[in-house]
Amino acid sequence: MSTIYNFKTVTVVPSYKDFIDIVLSKTQRKTPTVVHKGYHISRIRQFYMRKVKFTQKTINEKLTHILTEFPRMDDIHPFYGDLMHVLYDRDHYKVALGQVGAVRHMVDNVGRDYVRLLKYGDSLYRCKQLKRAALGRMATACKKLTSALVYLEKVRQHMSRLPSIDPNARTLLITGFPNVGKSSFMNKVTRADVEVQPYAFTTKSLFVGHTDFKYASWQVIDTPGILDHSLEERNVIEMQAITALAHLRACILFFMDLSTQCGHSIAQQVSLFKSIGPLFTGKPVIVVFNKSDLCTFDDITAEEQSLVMTAIEECGAKWITTSTLTDAGVGDLKTLACETLLAHRSEQKEGSGRFQAIQNRLYCAVPQKRDNVERPAYVPPSVEEIRQRLASGEPVRERRKTERDYEWENGGPGQYQPNERKTWDLENPEWVDDIIPDIMDGHNIYDNVDPDIHERLMELEAEEDARLQELELEASKKRPQYELHDSTVEAVRFIRDKIKVIKMERAMKNPSLRRTRRQSVAIEKFNKRTGSQVDRSATPGCSSETTNSSAKRGRSLSAAQEAVMRDRSSSHMSTKTTRGISSHSATRDRSLSVNRGEGYRDVNEKLRAVKLSKVVARPRNLQAKKGEGDRAIPNLRPKHLFTGKVKSNGRRDRR
């Protein structure tokens, strides 16, 4: 558990009346509220058992939350444990939390007993009375917490105002008689705005400030003044300082007022220093002679000086003189205290077993000389020259001028034009200022700057030729190894077309396959190209006029459109001619015929299967219409969801 506690997060503890109102209102809101005597008895029992169980569970959760959030004195740091004992009385605090735990156990027993009784309720009235008795006994049990809840709320309010003190951090602890300048020093070294008044016990509790030293944060704790009397006679204000002195591993700053304006003599202050001396065991102590602007250590008598120095030497403490009015010695006191505490903490770590275990594993490797040859550090000649000039008093050479220096020597920016060619290293220095044209004799000068440009060009051309040869070789591999004559190609095309026509004629002769318009069009195209006599007019039931009329159209006709055209053409014929044609016309193909492999015994079985498939597909077809074109309006307010106890705000339903 962390040593820094945040008591501000403890939830507010309600009073007894508020507690009961919270529990019962939650039970009313979260459980059903309507029951009728006509319901089955098991439903009525369940209704009231739910009420009792929910109330018992709610009280248990609330009381458990209180017990969990309040700290246990045995589990927290001893400093906070003793501080809470001083402020709130450990026994009273434990009794209050114990009462909360006892009432929680009592409520659980009441709920368990009445749930058992409700299982045997034989009517709505009896179940209701059992529920009423259960809630009443729970409320009566919670009434015993009236004083405990009030006390815990006061403790919570006071705990939320306690300072956040880390018992293990670097700490400077200020102590001494009242009105000796402790709070003034606190305000000087930290930003804590502690009240300072010219009377005693202005500071009535612990105040914490923070300061920085060597890039680390330090706690500075201002304690209330302590009077020189027995421990039993000290009040709560003084006991807070005693608790801090006893438990915090800090550097103790004991302030003394040699001018005795605090109302206590030097002897009394020395007596207090000796009486609380056992609390300084194992801690660095610094005695601060404050208010040096009024009285210094040299201004007091020799007897007082010897008395003070004897007490300091017995304790093994250090001493320093300061003045918070003139800031004399304030910074030195802060530095001395921090350095002393750091040294003390280092000594404690060195004496620990962990430090010894780590120290035994450390090894410091020191290089040894391999021969007698001296190998001094290398110093550049320029640096050695500067050292010699400095030793002899000669002026050191000036540094090399840069272009910026020349710029400011010649008028500043905009007036000086730097010469970028003066650092060029050419074969002939006279070539530096030569004017180089961009184009000469129709050639770009920069194309011939490279002396190897001709060789590079030849290499590039050779690479391009090799690449072209590779591409030609790949293309030659993709070409066919032989080529056909045009007449041979035409003969091959004629043979392929003839094979297609033969396949179409065979398909038309087969009665199981229907002849399509696309096949007839393909035959006509073949007749036009080859001069063959394969014509649709030879087909029974189709006249040459129909063929001619369809040939004039740009689009192919479907079977239905062909039938219409035949009807129109036949309307111009006489009745006898029509009868003659109809008597010799071909028979109509069956629309539903059983083909091999379909698995039907006859046409009737196939018709029955088609009808059943339509029936099965009907629900899916009904759902398929849902979309932008769907105009069906479903029931938007189903009665089973909107009947019952529904308030206007819409937050309650029938349950």
Swiss-Prot record:
Subcellular location: Nucleus, Nucleolus
GO biological process: ribosome biogenesis
PROSITE patterns in the cross-refs: G_OBG
Residues noted as binding GTP in the record, renumbered to the chain: 176-183, 222-226, 290-293
Region (Disordered): 389-420, 526-593
Transmembrane segments: none
Source organism, top-level taxon: Eukaryota
Residue stretches of biased makeup (Basic and acidic residues): 395-407
Keywords: GTP-binding, Nucleotide-binding, Nucleus, Ribosome biogenesis
InterPro entries linked to this entry: G_OBG, GTP-bd, NOG1, NOG1_N, NOG1_Rossman_fold_dom, NOG_C, P-loop_NTPase
Polar residues bias (residue ranges): 529-551, 571-585
UniProt key word Zinc-finger: no
Record-linked Pfam families: NOG1, NOG1_N, NOGCT
Molecular function terms, GO-annotated: GTP binding
Any single Gene Ontology cellular-component annotation: nucleolus
Family per similarity comment: Belongs to the TRAFAC class OBG-HflX-like GTPase superfamily. OBG GTPase family. NOG subfamily.
Subunit structure: Interacts with NOPP44/46.
Protein name as it appears in the record: Nucleolar GTP-binding protein 1
Organism: Trypanosoma brucei brucei
